[in-house]
Each structure stands twice: as structure tokens, then as C-alpha cells.
Amino acid sequence: LTEKNGIRIDVADPKNLGPIVGNTEALAAIAALLDAGKADLNGSTVSFPLSSGFSGFTDAAGLTKFNRALAARVAVYRKDWPAALTAVNESFYSLDGDFSTGVYDVFATGTGDQLNSAFFPQNQAGEVRLAHPSYATDIETGDDRISKASLRTSPTSSSGLSSDRDVWVYTSSTAPVPIIRNEELILIYAEANIQLGGAGLTAAVEALDKIRTSHNLLPYAGSVSSAALTTELLKQRRFSLFFEGHRWLDLRRYDLLSDVHVRD
């Protein structure tokens, strides 16, 4: 989240760990690890059990698509736009597919299972998860993603934030949490095309329109420029991927982590 703390890459010897490396080297190592995983999966047979969160992705072909989806995300973080597009097209990305298709962390109530700690009942007092009021004021009229920030029966406060809306993304204690899903891949496809420019801008508009119209909005009618489409992209990522762990990373990537933007 800070992009400054770094990670250790060399951990082969737990008694003699390698140095902490910076963001650029860390992302390069992650990308290389994903590439190695893809190579290992090629022609392999998967013999180990996977949770229900991997439904549809349990064989080598499915895991390769999952691997490429993660590689696309990493490529975006690295600003390697051609690599992002290549990885997206090798993933389970589908412009006309179900937005929820993907791989998930799953939860259950059985012995030894874990509950989703991001679930908080609506209208609860005390320990709450509140949506910033700007989520409701910034969203366009008719956008069905307003349901992710449900209106409370009465406002409350937590950690200095007062709001009349609860975060309502995970609606039960066993609701799955996406690791990566098709809607994010569509947005990655749009972002890479925006950054590549040229004919990519038209492809980006098509992808953004798919997001908009699927959430009850009219097609994009703004300027078809890299700057304007980046603003639109970040808006759609904000509402589509709300409470999935992307917003601050997105703002940091575009140098927008100011007090004005951090609120949401």
C-alpha cells in the first residue's frame, strides 16, 4: 500500500534472508514468478484440491488463465501496457462475459473454517464499516453500484468519519471476496488501451461503455482523449471495485493521493 516499504525476494534461507528491494525490483520479481508459474502449468495435470473459490479454474488451463489475470494486474502496476494487454487476452477476460466470473477467497461456518471479517451487518452500532458520504454524492443518478453503500436508518461515526451509509459489498459472514474477476479485467483492458493511445482509445471507450451500460448508465459522452478517459476509468474503477482493495493503489499510481481524494 505504501509503495515504499519493499519486500524480500530472496527467502530461500530463512536464517539468512536476502535484502529488502524497492517497488520496481519487487514488481519485476512478481511478474517473473507469474511467468514461471505459467510455464510450469503448461502441459501439467493438477492433482491437488482447490477450494470452491476456484470453480471453473481447477485444471491447468483454468489456472493459467487465473495466472495471466494476475499478470495483467502486475503489468498495469509496472506501466507495461503492451504486457498488460497480452496478459488480459490470455486470461479469462470477456467483454461480454459475467462481471463476477473469477477466482475468490471463500468462507464457511464449519469447523476450522473462517468467516469473512469484512462483513458488518447493516445499521450496526459500535464496530461499523462506513462508506464516505462522497460515494453517494459522486455516483451518477441511476447507477446500481449505489447498493454497495446502503443507506443507514440513522447516521453514525467511526474513526472521525460520519456517514449515513454502510459499506455493503459483502452481505453475509460467508460472502466470498474476489481475488480477481472479469470486471477488473475489462477495466485493465480499458486502462492499457488508454495509455497506448491511438486506436486504443476507441477500444477503451467500448470497454468503459460496457461497464457503464451494465450498471444502468448511458454510454460515455465525454472527450476521447487520454486525460479524459483516464478520469473516467478511475471513476469506474472506484465504483466497480469498491471495497476490493484497489482505490488507494489507483490514486497512488496516478499521483492523486491528496487529502481531497483520500476521503473515498
Describe every region a protein language model picked out.
Residues 34, 79-186, 217, 226, ...:
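Hydrophobic-face positions in mid-chain alpha helices that act as interaction patches
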Residues 1-57, 78, 97-125:
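Aromatic-anchored glycine-rich loop motif in surface-exposed flexible loops
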Residues 53-65, 222-226:
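A glycine-rich, coil/turn loop motif that links secondary-structure elements
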Residues 202-205, 223, 245:
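Non-catalytic, surface-exposed connector residues within folded enzymatic/regulatory domains
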Residues 1-7, 26-41, 59-91, 143, ...:
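Extended, hydrophobic/aromatic-rich amphipathic alpha-helical segments that build helical scaffolds
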Residues 18-23, 56-61, 171-179:
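Solvent-exposed loop and edge beta-strand segments that line ligand/cofactor-binding
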